[in-house]
Regions:
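C-terminal subdomain of the subtilisin-like protease fold in secreted/lumenal serine endopeptidases
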Residues: 34, 240, 244, 264-302, ...
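Extracellular S/T/G-rich loop segment that most often corresponds to the catalytic His/Ser-adjacent loop
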Residues: 183-184, 189, 322, 337-414, ...
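Gly/Ser-rich catalytic serine loop of serine hydrolases
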Residues: 212-223, 329-333, 389-402
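Protease zymogen maturation seam
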Residues: 26-34, 38-40, 57-183, 438-484, ...
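Helix N-cap motif at beta-to-alpha junctions
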Residues: 46-52
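Short, surface-exposed ligand-recognition loops at beta-strand->loop->(often short) alpha-helix junctions
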Residues: 1-12
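Active-site-proximal beta-strand/loop segments in catalytic clefts of secreted hydrolases
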Residues: 3-4, 47, 66-69, 153, ...
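Subtilisin-like serine protease catalytic core
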Residues: 142-143, 160, 170-205, 212-264, ...
C-alpha cells in the first residue's frame, strides 16, 4: 500500500475508517513493514478482503497492490534463442576440478589476462609534480567484446563458424582518471560474490532482504551484473564501489516487499552514509539535500508490467539525485508497458546483438528506451567458478554496461540530472538497419559509447559480419516468442 505524501500515514491512522477497523482488531498489529524515503510513504499490511475494499476508498491512500512475487529471468530460455558460441561443461570426474571449455582462465593476477597501459601525449600526459590532469587514455588489451564495442564507433568482426577467432584481438580504450572511485553503484539483485578477486576489494555488503541464512550470491545473476559494472577485467568502471543489495533468493525469486526494501536502503545509504559510513560525493559535511552533488547509481535488471507504486518509488529516488538505470525487458514488446522502464527520468537500456549490430530479437523497444548496449553472449564473472568467466544473454547484461558508464560520468563531475543527456550526446547513432525498426515505433537508433574513439587498424576499414544468409535463417527459425514467460503479477529479471 502506498500513501499520498509524507503526512498521509498519520492522517490515515487517525481517519474514521481506521477507527472503525480498530473496533474489530488493532490495525497496527497487522502492519508488517513500513517504507519511508523522501516523500514516498508505504507499508505492507495483512488485511481481509472486506477491509481492503474500504481502504482503497480512503483519500489518503494512493493505491493498494498485492505483495506479488517476482523471479529471475530464465537464462536458459534466452540462451536457447541466440546461443551459437562456446559451452561450459562442468565435469568434475573422480572428485577432480570442473573442466570448463572455451574460456581463458582468469586467475586475477593482472597482466596474465588483463593488460593495462596508458597512452598520452602533450596536454593529456599525466604530471608527476602533483598537478595531475583529468584525461589520458588507457588501453585494456585482449578486452572482452562488450568493452571493445563500447569504445568503438564501428562494428567488430565475428565469425559464427569460429566464435573464438577474434577473442584476443580487441582493445578497450578509456580515460585513466575518473574511473568511479567516488561513486557507489548499488546492485539490487540476487547478491554479489563480494570477495571475488576481480573486484579488487571494492565490493561491499549492503543489505540482505531475503534473510535466508545464505550470504552472498547463490544464484549467479547478481555477480555477473556487478562484474559488468565494475570488475577489473569485465567492468566498464574500474574503480567504482559495488554495493550488494540482495533482493532475490537462490532461485532468483523475491517479492515486491524485498524490492521496495532495497530501494529504501539505497535512499538512506546514499543520503546519509555513503561508503564506509561517510558521504562519497564530497566532504564529510556534505548535506543530503545537495541533490546535484550526489554520486550514486542503482542498477535494476528487473521489471514488471506497468505499476504505479514502483514508478512512484523510483521517481522519489531520482528527485533525491540518485541515478537509476533499468533494463528494458526481454519480451520483444513496447517497454512503455512495463515498470520501472516507463518512468520518464530513468535510463532505460535495451540490448543489441553486437555480432550483427542489430537490436536483439528478445529486447523490448519503443520511445521509453533511451539507449542500447551489448546484450548477447556477454562475458562476465561467475559465482560458481571464480576463476572462469561465463556468458549470459539479456537486457540484464546490457543494463550494467550503461550503469558502469554512468559511474564514469558521475565521477568526472557531471550532475545526476545531466547524465542521460550526456549519454545521448556520446552515443553512436544510426547503427541499426532502418528496416529492423519499422515495427518498433519510437525506438531510438542509438548505442552506448564511452567517448574514446580509437579504431583498431586491422578491422576499421572492413564491413562485418561476414556470414551466410543460411546461418541467419537457421537462427531466426529457432526463435519462439512463446518461450518468454509473461505474467501481470510478476517482476522478472531481464
Amino acid at each position: 500500500m502506498s500513501l499520498k505524501g509524507p503526512k498521509a500515514f498519520q492522517r490515515f491512522m487517525d481517519s474514521q475508517l481506521v477507527q472503525e477497523i480498530l473496533e474489530s482488531k488493532p490495525i497496527r498489529k497487522r502492519i508488517i513493514k513500513t517504507y519511508s524515503f523522501g516523500n514516498f510513504r508505504g507499508f505492507v499490511i495483512d488485511l481481509p478482503n472486506e477491509w481492503l475494499i474500504k481502504i482503497r476508498r480512503s483519500p489518503f491512500v494512493s493505491q493498494v497492490v498485492p505483495n506479488f512475487s517476482f523471479k529471475a529471468f530464465d537464462e536458459e530460455t534466452a540462451l536457447s534463442e541466440v546461443y551459437r558460441g562456446r559451452t561450459i561443461v562442468a565435469r568434475g570426474e573422480n572428485g577432480g576440478s570442473p573442466e570448463l571449455h572455451g574460456f581463458k582462465k582468469d586467475e586475477c593476477r593482472g597482466d596474465s589476462v588483463y593488460f593495462d597501459k596508458f597512452e598520452a601525449s602533450g596536454k593529456d600526459m599525466p604530471q608527476v609534480n602533483g598537478k595531475l590532469l583529468s584525461r589520458y587514455i588507457k588501453t585494456q588489451s585482449e578486452a572482452p567484446r562488450h568493452l571493445a564495442r563500447l569504445s568503438r564507433r564501428s562494428q567488430l568482426p565475428y565469425d559464427f563458424n569460429d566464435p573464438t577467432r577474434y577473442e584476443s584481438d580487441f582493445n578497450y580504450y578509456y580515460y585513466g582518471w575518473h574511473q568511479g572511485r567516488s561513486v557507489n553503484a548499488y546492485v539490487l539483485d540476487s547478491g554479489v560474490m563480494i570477495d571475488h578477486c576481480d573486484f579488487e576489494g571494492r565490493a561491499y555488503y549492503g543489505a540482505d532482504f531475503i534473510r535466508s541464512g545464505n550470504s552472498g550470491d547463490q544464484n549467479g545473476h547478481g555477480t555477473h551484473v556487478a562484474g559488468l559494472i565494475g570488475s577489473k577485467t569485465y567492468g566498464v568502471s574500474k574503480k567504482v564501489n559495488i554495493i550488494d543489495v540482495k533482493v532475490l533468493d537462490s532461485v532468483g525469486s523475491g517479492t515486491l516487499d524485498t524490492v521496495m526494501s532495497g530501494l529504501e536502503f539505497v535512499s538512506n545509504h546514499c543520503n546519509y552514509k555513503g561508503k564506509q559510513g561517510k558521504p562519497v560525493w564530497g566532504s564529510e559535511d556534505s548535506h543530503d539535500d545537495d541533490v546535484e552533488s550526489k554520486r550514486c547509481v542503482i542498477n535494476l535488471s528487473l521489471g514488471t508490467f506497468r505499476s504505479t507504486i514502483i514508478n512512484e518509488a523510483i521517481e522519489e529516488l531520482i528527485k533525491q539525485g540518485i541515478v537509476v538505470v533499468v533494463a528494458a525487458g526481454n519480451s520483444n514488446m513496447n517497454a512503455c508497458w512495463t515498470s520501472p522502464a516507463s518512468v520518464a527520468d530513468v535510463i532505460t537500456v535495451g540490448a543489441f546483438d553486437d555480432r550483427i549490430d542489430s537490436i536483439a530479437k528478445f529486447s523490448n523497444w519503443g520511445n521509453c528506451v533511451d539507449i542500447f548496449a551489448p546484450g548477447v553472449l556477454v562475458k562476465s564473472l561467475s559465482n560458481k567458478f571464480p576463476y572462469y568467466p561465463i556468458e549470459q544473454t539479456g537486457t540484464s547484461m546490457a543494463t550494467p554496461i550503461v550503469t558502469g558508464l554512468v559511474a564514469l560520468l558521475l565521477d568526472s563531475g557531471i550532475k545526476p540530472t545531466q547524465i542521460k543527456k550526456r549519454l545521448n550526446e556520446l552515443a553512436t547513432d544510426n547503427i541499426f538497419p532502418r528496416r529492423t525498426l519499422l515495427f518498433k515505433p519510437g525506438t531510438p537508433n542509438r548505442i552506448a559509447f564511452n567517448g574514446v574513439k580509437r579504431d583498431d587498424d586491422d578491422y576499421h576499414h572492413y564491413s562485418y559480419p561476414n556470414i551466410t544468409i543460411e546461418h541467419i535463417l537457421k537462427e531466426l527459425d529457432s526463435y519462439n516468442p512463446s518461450n518468454y514467460k509473461r505474467s501481470t503479477l510478476s517482476l522478472t529479471l531481464v
